[in-house]
């Protein structure tokens, strides 16, 4: 179900509760999992900000958060945002976007934590910790609890590597070419950041591969196929990280 706006946080919570009741009746014990792209940008828009009744807090976008050079501030943002997500019935954040901003021509440049791999790694870790960790009375087990939201880091193995800055949502952006032959650098925000948290949840709970074909990056099988179908990139490199 794609739901892109609601009347108010109350309506969103009621909608979520009704969806949960529906799946509980199926008897398989699998809950509904409502997810959302980032909702806290400073600019108000109908879908993400006004679409939640206008009550959600507003923050700088990802590139702005990174420009603070303050991972602790980003962690605090994650804590606040996760509480608001849960109030709306959202259990999974389709964020953070932790691609390195390799090419300024890329249309999703502003959704990254910038070009510096060390800064992007630290901010990615803080963001995921903030979203996923519940503490004190809100914790149920191992850092997870009533204020936890699954963080889906994206885009493995680096979405800022498109040929000439073209975006892979479109056919003309099919190839990730990794200027500078820097695959290892591109995955640092994943391997050293989102997968090595300071909090008890330990690592990001979900990963979204990018839609590119990471050209000539498969050093084992030599396959040039979409990232999600590349055994080396997914089974060997991602799951082995």
Which functions belong to the PLM regions below?
Residues 1-241:
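Glycoside hydrolase catalytic-domain context in secreted enzymes
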């Amino acid at each position: 179900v794609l739901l892109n706006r609601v009347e108010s946080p109350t309506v969103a919570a009621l909608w979520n509760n009704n969806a949960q009741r529906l799946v509980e009746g199926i008897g398989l014990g699998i809950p509904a999992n409502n997810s959302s792209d980032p909702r806290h940008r400073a600019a108000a828009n109908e879908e993400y900000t006004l679409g939640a009744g206008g009550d959600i807090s507003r923050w700088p976008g990802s590139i702005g958060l990174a420009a603070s050079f303050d991972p602790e501030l980003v962690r605090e943002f994650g804590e606040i945002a996760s509480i608001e997500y849960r109030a709306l019935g959202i259990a999974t954040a389709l964020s953070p976007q932790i691609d390195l901003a390799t090419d300024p021509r890329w249309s999703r440049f502003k959704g990254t934590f910038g070009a510096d791999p060390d800064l992007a790694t630290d901010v990615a870790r803080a963001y995921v910790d903030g979203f996923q960790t519940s503490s004190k009375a809100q914790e149920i087990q191992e850092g997870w609890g009533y204020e936890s939201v699954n963080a889906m880091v994206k885009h493995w193995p680096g979405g800022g590597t498109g040929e000439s800055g073209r975006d892979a949502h479109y056919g003309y952006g099919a190839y990730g070419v990794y200027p500078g032959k820097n695959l290892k650098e591109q995955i640092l925000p994943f391997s050293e950041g989102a997968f090595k948290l300071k909090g008890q949840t330990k690592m990001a709970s979900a990963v979204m591969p990018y839609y590119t074909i990471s050209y000539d990056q498969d050093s084992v099988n030599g396959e040039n196929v979409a990232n999600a179908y590349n055994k080396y990139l997914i089974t060997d490199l991602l799951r082995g990280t």
